[in-house]
From Swiss-Prot:
Protein name stated in the entry: Uncharacterized protein YtiA
Domain of life: Bacteria
Organism in which the protein naturally occurs: Escherichia coli (strain K12)
One Pfam match: Se_S_carrier
InterPro entries membership: Se/S_carrier-like
Length: 85
């Protein structure tokens, strides 16, 4: 298991992802974005899951990026743009 940090373009992404994770019984927490990272709406979701499974929780247009810590350094493992309206 590994912990991943999800950033979102807006709070709507946080809310929708939280609802999906709760419904699936996943282990996660919502918190402020760590100070050494910047992005999105100011809130993030920490998700604990096996590596590779984090991608299934990406919501197109709402998820901004996914990070994990490697040797104490934040690594962006995926970045997503905003969907056009």
């Amino acid at each position: 298991m590994k912990e991943f940090l999800f950033l979102f373009h807006s709070t709507v992404g946080v809310i929708q992802t939280r609802k999906a994770l709760q419904a699936a019984g996943m282990t996660f927490r919502v918190s402020d974005i760590p100070r050494d990272l910047r992005g999105g709406c100011g809130l993030c979701i920490w998700l604990t899951c096996p590596p590779g499974e984090e991608i299934q929780w990406v919501i197109p247009g709402l998820t901004e990026s996914i990070y994990c810590q490697q040797d104490g350094v934040w690594r962006c493992i995926a970045h997503y743009g905003v969907s056009p309206r």
